[in-house]
């Protein structure tokens, strides 16, 4: 039986590390499934940068941000250790812009569209997010929350 593959939205990764979040338990369990090689995890370079930004931000982390050194260590040990497949943006940048134009999307939506364009190329079993409304009008994307996978 082939393992399912899951392309992660950044919010799920953040919740996996934020023990105060109501989404922490399911997100952390899903992350553990990747680390234990039970499912195939896929992320983008963008996820790494967004995760760094959020984990070092005092307001996003409820006054308890991680230091740059702590985040560097976390990223290297968890996400850059070979457990996740990380895709670059080079092949999908034009497609991202084309989709945003076609769907008349603007501002911060471009970042969601960038992840979406990568899922079109790499075709994971699921795209996992707690922000399903951000992606619901996009074709060829099977959305799940961590709760629906675990």
Regions found by a protein language model. Give the residues of each.
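Short beta-strand segments at enzyme active-site cores
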Residues: 42-45, 129
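Conserved glycosyltransferase catalytic-site signature
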Residues: 10, 45, 109-113
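Acidic, PIN/NYN-like endoribonuclease modules and their adjacent C-terminal/linker elements
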Residues: 1-5, 113-150
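Active-site neighborhoods of divalent-metal-dependent phosphate/nucleic-acid chemistry enzymes
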Residues: 83-130
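Structured helix-beta-strand junction loops
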Residues: 37-38, 81, 138
């Amino acid at each position: 039986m082939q393992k399912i593959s899951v392309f992660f939205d950044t919010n799920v990764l953040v919740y996996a590390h934020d023990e105060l979040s109501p989404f922490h338990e399911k997100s952390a369990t899903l992350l553990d499934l990747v680390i234990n090689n039970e499912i195939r995890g896929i992320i983008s370079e963008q996820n790494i940068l967004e995760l760094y930004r959020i984990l070092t931000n005092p307001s996003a982390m409820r006054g308890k941000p991680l230091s740059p050194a702590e985040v560097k260590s976390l990223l290297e040990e968890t996400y850059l250790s070979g457990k996740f497949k990380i895709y670059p943006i080079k092949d999908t940048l034009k497609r991202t812009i084309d989709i945003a134009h076609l769907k008349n999307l603007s501002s911060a939506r471009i970042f969601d569209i960038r992840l979406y364009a990568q899922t079109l190329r790499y075709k994971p079993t699921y795209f996992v997010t707690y922000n399903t409304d951000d992606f619901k009008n996009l074709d060829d994307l099977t959305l799940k929350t961590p709760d629906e996978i675990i």
